[in-house]
Amino acid sequence: IKVKAAILRSGTDRPPEDYKNHLTRLAALQAYNQAGLGPEDMSVAEVHDATAVGEVIQIENLGFVEFGEGGPASLRGDTKIGGRIPVNPSGGLESKGHPVGATGIGQVFELVTQLRGEAGARQVEGAQNAIAENGGGLHGVEEAAACVTILGR
């Protein structure tokens, strides 16, 4: 399994209405560019969902859906295993736990397991590329820091 991109960015004082310049979105765009891939190339994602709205916000920021479509996409089942872009097959932070300081490596472990085809009942079939998004702290209206990692077979 190869690391195709790893981006760490710091938060800004952007106004809340400037959501298209969200820290995670900018980090994701940079990661996609570094990897030579796009959202459509991702087979599976692990995102920081310490709160229920986390998945909704981050699937928009990662470019899987248009802004404002994250909630409907999740409700349709687009983000479940077998959906258009499986998100958090590990169960996510609210389900498996949020070991602050180790959350990111837990996400990467899950994605490596997926890409190796070793995830058992949670396996995303045929996974080729995977993306992890992790954030922490608070700076204004977004994370103080965000990391986006893209892995591939």
Summary of predicted features, one role per range:
Residues 22, 26, 30, 40, ...:
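Feature representing long, continuous alpha-helical segments
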Residues 55-89, 152-153:
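Glycine- and aromatic-enriched membrane alpha-helices
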Residues 21-35, 110-116:
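Short, well-ordered amphipathic alpha-helical segments that serve as non-catalytic structural scaffolds
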Residues 1-26, 30, 78-90, 95, ...:
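Condensing-enzyme catalytic core mediating Claisen C-C bond formation in acyl metabolism
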Residues 15-19, 49-72, 99, 138-147:
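Short glycine/threonine-rich loop-to-helix capping motif typified by GTGT followed
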Residues 99-119:
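Active-site-proximal alpha-helical scaffold in enzymes
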Residues 39-43, 67:
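Short acidic capping loops at alpha-helix termini that bridge into adjacent secondary structure
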Residues 6-11, 43-52:
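A short beta-alpha structural unit
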